[in-house]
């Protein structure tokens, strides 16, 4: 607290919030997950993400991008669809992609396939704009978004009644997540 958020310890705090988010999601507890999302935002001010040398957004922006995933995990489809895009989509490139992913899954789950397809296009376009150097732990965000692309594709295909193609896409998602 003495030196605020503008130090290396912000990374440790974000890492801890990330563990709380995913632990709560695994345990089926939305409230702790959302509190941890809020904590991540509070511990990582935008001014820190705007530091260019070293490029702090590449290290930390992904950690404030998980709320859309929490909404998907708990089937909060309408909230996911209504989730606002960040004003600065270049700075918050990971969050922007996650919002489109969550909206796409939400629309698919509600049977709104045309809207889901539009969000899939938006997701793929947002994915292309994520800097290659952006990371979450030891993973590049681009690699993780590729997992989401196949997952979203599978969700949409399933809602279109193309079950074999849907399950093939979902298997590709799992294979990408498992890694080489």
Give short role names for the model-derived ranges.
Residues 2-7, 41-57, 83-94, 124-142, ...:
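Solenoid-like repeat scaffolds
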Residues 36, 83, 119-122, 169:
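Alpha-helical solenoid repeat scaffolds, predominantly canonical TPR units
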Residues 148, 163-180:
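Generic long, charged, amphipathic alpha-helical segments
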Residues 19, 66, 98, 102, ...:
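"A position-specific structural signal for the A-helix of alpha-solenoid helical repeats
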């Amino acid at each position: 607290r003495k030196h605020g958020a503008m130090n290396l310890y912000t990374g440790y705090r974000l890492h801890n919030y990330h563990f709380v988010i995913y632990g709560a999601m695994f345990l089926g507890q939305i409230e702790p997950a959302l509190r941890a999302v809020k904590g991540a935002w509070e511990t990582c001010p935008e001014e820190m993400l705007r530091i260019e040398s070293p490029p702090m957004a590449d290290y930390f922006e992904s950690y404030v991008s998980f709320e859309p995933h929490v909404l998907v995990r708990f089937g909060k489809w309408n909230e996911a669809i209504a989730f606002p895009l960040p004003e600065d989509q270049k700075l918050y490139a990971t969050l922007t992609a996650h919002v489109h992913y969550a909206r796409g899954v939400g629309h698919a789950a509600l049977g709104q396939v045309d809207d889901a397809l539009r969000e899939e296009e938006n997701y793929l376009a947002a994915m292309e704009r994520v800097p290659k150097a952006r990371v979450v732990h030891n993973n590049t965000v681009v690699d993780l978004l590729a997992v989401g692309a196949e997952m979203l594709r599978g969700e949409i295909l399933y809602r279109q009644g193309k079950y074999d193609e849907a399950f093939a896409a979902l298997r590709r998602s799992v294979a990408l997540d498992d890694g080489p």
